[in-house]
Amino acid sequence: MSRIVSVGISEFKIASAPTILMTYGLGSCVGIALHDPVALTGGLAHTLLPAPVRGMDSMVKSAKFTCWAVDLMVEELIKCGCVAERLVAKLAGGATMFEPQHRTTHSGIGERNVTAAKEALERRGIPLVASDTGDDYGRSLEFNTVTGVITVRALQRPIKRM
C-alpha cells in the first residue's frame, strides 16, 4: 500500500516508492514533478509565483518561486540517491483563472509560472516529458513515485494520466 504525502502551496516534498505525492488547488500555481525511474524516487513542488521581485533576490530560496523550485528539488533528490541525468519532469497548472474584464496588471501569472518552470528545467537539462497547463480551470495532482504517472483531476473534466 502506498503512503500519501500532501504538498502544500509554496512547498516541495521528496519521496521514495511506494508513495503518492499529492497537491490540490493548482490555479495559476504550477505543479512540477521530477522522477528518477531507476531510484523510484521523485519530488513534487507546488509553486506560487514565477520569481521574486527585485530586491528579494537575497532572501532564502523556497519553492514559493517557480524559478528556484527545480534546483531545490534536484539538490534533495541527489541527496536521496537519484542521478540528475535520469530525472524527467512533468508539469501541470498555470491556468488563467479570471475573466479578461477582471484581470489586473498582475495577470498572466499562470503563463509566467509555466515559462519559468520550463526555463528552470532547460537550465538543468531535465526533459519535460508531459504537461497539462494553461486553460481556465484549476487542477489537483497525484504523483505515483513507483510508476512516475501523474493523475490530473479537475472539476467537470475527464481525469488525465500522464
UniProtKB/Swiss-Prot annotation:
It catalyses: L-glutaminyl-[protein] + H2O = L-glutamyl-[protein] + NH4(+). One of its GO terms (molecular function) is protein-glutamine glutaminase activity. Gene3D superfamilies: 3.30.1330.200. GO terms for biological process: chemotaxis. Its EC number is 3.5.1.44. It holds the Pfam family CheD. Probably deamidates glutamine residues to glutamate on methyl-accepting chemotaxis receptors (MCPs), playing an important role in chemotaxis. This is Probable chemoreceptor glutamine deamidase CheD 3. The keyword Hydrolase applies. Keywords: Chemotaxis, Hydrolase. InterPro entries: CheD-like_sf (IPR038592), Chemorcpt_Glu_NH3ase_CheD (IPR005659), Cytotoxic_necrot_fac-like_cat (IPR011324). Belongs to the CheD family. HAMAP family: CheD (MF_01440).
